[in-house]
Regions:
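Short amphipathic alpha-helical segments enriched in hydrophobics
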Residues: 54, 98, 182-185
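Class I S-adenosyl-L-methionine
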Residues: 37, 54, 358-361
């Protein structure tokens, strides 16, 4: 960016072009640092350079000292191409280092920088149709409705998801945007969409500090939105949660009054009996890679303890029952070779590892600092658990988990291959054996149960299938569908998202209430909020709320009643 009165110059040719490394290394004087920071506000190329160079210190932690120094030219086994800049050289050497490491998972991994690539050529599907982002925020009041909104639905329906602000980068790591509706007295009072304005929203913050520790304020907050102890939290699993208001404005990072020095999973579990919120943090370079936390019904953090896992695995979800907490240690591991040679937003830095034993870790809720028991299972990966519950019978005590299971995940790249299907795991606490059985062969994702029955034997679970919602009767092991096809049998559009159950006031029956979901119509390129009567799941929706804009595909959300 030229100074006032100066002609345009080629990128990198201005007066500040050589200041980036000195700034990152802390070598600028106070006056020069302030001048350079003022310049960064308006100069994209310098901001990108600083973001790139910030990765150098964590990268060095991956390498032996002799790997950083230029190799002996006589050593033909060291194939490091001539590189004009330090970072490229370090990347090349680090790639070689990870390739020859005898035990790559013992390396200290460092996530790459926020430098982006052209996702149109790498992940074209994530920029077309309903994966395309929307580019502004709006508010609309008194939305048109087809049908009738049940008068007792008074509250907010909120859903979070990635909404990239540029044409670059993987869709999954786009900035979080919450789409919300306020329902009251049979009206759709308002619709709002708002970005979650984290501290790294305007000025990207590297996810790791120079010493390899995590920067918990570096967040895109794009995965889930939950309410607990009077606070609404936007979540992304490698950072602190961010609190938002009832009007969806960002209030700031939330660390439980300074007590939480860890990230928070995007899938916390709120016990319907005690009101406690259970969650874990993951993503630490150093051990412990995972820690378990518990907050009481008033939002006070009461328990924090490490969970012993041997490597930095991708742990996205976990399970809570009346008596137990269950963690999944599955063979999808952080791969430093991918992390230091690929942009994080181009290729997610996790790879399948055949040598890592898949297992489930069980912790008693009444002994939160006690020993975990580990149970081996067949290799697989699970993003989402539908539900879990305890069983006591003549054959012994057990824990049942109903999960959406992939046979494997990301062996060679972070492209999605096989679909997930519904499976049941039964952990026999007496014999130590896990019984694994497939319940259905349909490809489904984003399962939900009635949240009031989380941790107990809920009868119904609803998941997203191909052009349909699939409801499983988990007592009878049967399924029915609410289809959104083009055959005219239903007038709703064709692509539903996660369905959230909103119970009827004063009713405990799982069929007394409604499923809420955003549904995308590819013909009109628009979206509706669809309300389905749980007692007439296959029938027409009772209401379709016409939204003023398309709601892109996203992840998770919740119904928050008054």
């Amino acid at each position: 960016m030229p100074r006032d009165g100066e002609p345009d110059m080629p990128q990198g040719a201005h007066d500040f072009a050589m200041w980036d490394a000195a700034y990152v290394l802390g070598a600028l004087s106070d006056a020069d640092r302030l001048e350079f920071e003022a310049h960064l506000v308006g100069c994209i190329s310098c901001r990108e350079a600083v973001t790139e160079l910030t990765a150098v210190s964590p990268l060095l932690s991956l390498l032996d000292y002799d790997q950083v120094i230029a190799p002996d030219a006589s050593d033909e086994s060291v194939a490091v191409p001539p590189c004009p800049d330090l970072l490229t050289s370090l990347l090349a050497k680090a790639e070689q280092r990870s390739a020859v490491a005898s035990d790559p998972v013992e390396l200290r991994p460092a996530l790459m920088t926020a430098t982006t690539v052209d996702a149109q050529t790498v992940f074209p599907v994530f920029r077309t149709g309903n994966y395309a982002p929307v580019h502004d925020e709006l508010t609309a009041f008194d939305l048109p409705v087809e049908g009738s909104i049940p008068a007792e639905l008074n509250g907010w329906y909120l859903r979070n998801g990635p909404n990239p602000r540029t044409g670059a980068g993987h869709w999954c790591v786009g900035d979080g945007m919450v789409h919300g509706l306020r329902l009251e007295n049979g009206r759709a009072a308002w619709y709002r969409n708002r970005w979650v304005r984290t501290e790294s929203f305007e000025h990207p913050i590297p996810p790791y500090n120079d010493d390899g520790s995590r920067n918990l304020h570096s967040s895109i907050a794009n995965t889930h939105v939950v309410r607990h102890a009077g606070k609404t939290l936007a979540l992304m699993e490698f950072s602190l949660p961010y609190e938002i208001s009832n009007d969806l404005e960002t209030l700031g990072a939330y660390d439980f009054g300074g007590k939480l020095a860890d990230s928070m999973t995007a899938h916390p579990k709120i016990c319907p009996t005690t009101g406690e919120m259970h969650f874990f943090g993951s993503g630490n370079i150093f051990e412990p890679h995972v820690s378990y936390h518990r907050a009481d019904a008033d939002g006070r953090l009461t328990i924090s303890r490490p969970i012993d896992v041997p490597a930095l695995t991708l742990m996205h979800d976990f399970a809570l029952t009346a008596d137990h907490v269950v963690f999944m240690d599955l063979p999808l591991l952080f791969d430093p070779g991918v992390a230091i040679t690929q942009q994080f937003d181009r290729d997610l830095p996790y790879r399948w590892d055949d040598q890592h034993q898949a297992r489930l870790g069980v912790l008693r809720r009444d002994d939160p600092y006690g020993r975990l028991r580990w149970f081996d299972i067949d290799p697989c990966f699970v993003f989402h658990i539908a539900n879990a519950y305890d069983v006591t019978s003549a054959s012994g005590d057990s824990i049942v988990l109903e999960v959406l299971r992939y046979p494997e995940m990301w062996r060679d790249s972070s492209e999605f291959g096989d679909d997930a299907a519904l499976w049941r795991w039964k952990i026999n606490l007496d014999t130590g054996v896990v019984e694994e059985s497939q319940l259905d062969d349909r490809g489904v994702e984003f399962p939900r149960v009635d949240d009031r029955l989380a941790g107990s034997a809920a009868r119904y679970s609803v998941a997203v299938g191909s052009g349909a919602l699939v409801r499983y009767d988990l007592q009878r092991d049967t399924a029915t569908e609410h289809r959104f096809g083009a055959d005219g049998s239903h007038r709703a559009p064709s692509a539903p998202g996660e369905a959230v159950f909103a119970p009827a006031v004063g009713q405990s029956d799982e069929l007394a209430g409604w499923y809420l979901t955003y549904v995308y119509d590819p013909v009109t390129d628009g979206s509706d909020l669809v309300v389905i009567d749980a007692s007439d799941f296959e029938g027409d929706p009772v209401a379709r709320i016409r939204l003023p804009r398309r709601v892109p595909h996203g992840f998770h959300g919740n119904w928050i009643p008054d």
